[in-house]
Amino acid sequence: MEANVTIPIWQNKPHGAARSVVRRIGTNLPLKPCPRASFETLPNISDLCLRDVPPVPTLADIAWIAADEEETYARVRSDTRPLRHTWKPSPLIVMQRNASVPNLRGSEERLLALKKPALPALSRTTELQDELSHLRSQIAKIVAADAASASLTPDFLSPGSSNVSSPLPCFGSSFHSTTSFVISDITEETEIEVPELPSVPLLCSASPECCKPEHKATCSSSEEDDCVSLSKASSFADMMGILKDFHRMKQSQDLSRSSLKEEDPAVLISEVLRRKFALKEEDISRKGN
C-alpha cells in the first residue's frame, strides 16, 4: 500500500536541482536581460539651443519627428531653429538624406529614352528627305532645260522670221512658267520651290547682242547652237549618274510592279534611294562582321 502512494511535488524534499522548476529551466536555458535603450548625444549642440527643454529625449520627441514636414535632418526637440529659412544643413546631412531617398530620376530617363525614336532611324530619314529634295530640283532643271531648248530654235531668232519684233520679256515669262515644275512625293505633298536656272543669264552674257532688239538680225545660227549646247551641258553634267540609275531600274523592274506608273518620277526616286541605302547597310554589316 505504501509503495503505491503518490507523493505530490510540493511535499517532496527540496534538495539539488529538482527543488524548483525555475532553477531547472535556468540550468538548461540561461536567461539574459534585454539590453537597455541608450541615447547618443549630438555633438556641437550649444547651451542656447537647449533652453527649458530637457536634453534627455522622450517619446514626445519621437512623435515630434514623425509629425515633422519633410525634415529628415530633425533630431530632437532641443535642436530648434529659430530662423528656419536661413538654416542650411551640413553637407554630411545632405549626403545621408540623398542616400536614403531612392534614385527615381534614372528610371524616368530610361522611360523617356524608350519612348523617344531611335537616332539612327531619324538621321536616315533626314538623309532620305534631303537627297529626295535635291533630286527633285535636278529633275526640274532638266525638264526646264528641255522645254527651253525646244522653244529656242534657229527659226526663232532668224532674221527673216516674224518673231524678231517680239520682245525678250515674253521669253522670260515662258521660262518662269517652265521652272515651276513640281514633282509630287509619296510621303509628303509639300511643293519645293525650284531655284532659277543659271542658263538664262549665261545665255544672255554669252550673246549680249541677242538680248537687244536692234542686234537680233546679226546673230548667226552657229552662235545660237553654241549657247544652247553650253546651257544643256551645264544642266546635264551632274545628272548622268542619276539617269543611269533610272535606266537600270526600269530594266530590272519585276512583273509584280506593273500596276505602278512607270512615268511617275517619285516612284523611281524612292526605289533608287531604297536600293542605295540597302546596299549601304549591307556594306556596314559586312565591315562589322
Curated annotation (Swiss-Prot):
The modification Phosphothreonine is found at residue 27. GO terms for biological process: aerobic respiration; mitochondrial fission. InterPro entries: Mtfr1. It is found in: Mitochondrion outer membrane. Its main location: mitochondrion. The modification Phosphoserine is found at residues 38, 100, 107, 221-222, 235, 258, 270. It comes from the Eukaryota. This is Mitochondrial fission regulator 1-like. Belongs to the MTFR1 family. GO terms for cellular component: mitochondrial outer membrane; mitochondrion. Signal peptide: none annotated. Keywords: Membrane, Mitochondrion, Mitochondrion outer membrane, Phosphoprotein. Pfam families: Mito_fiss_reg.
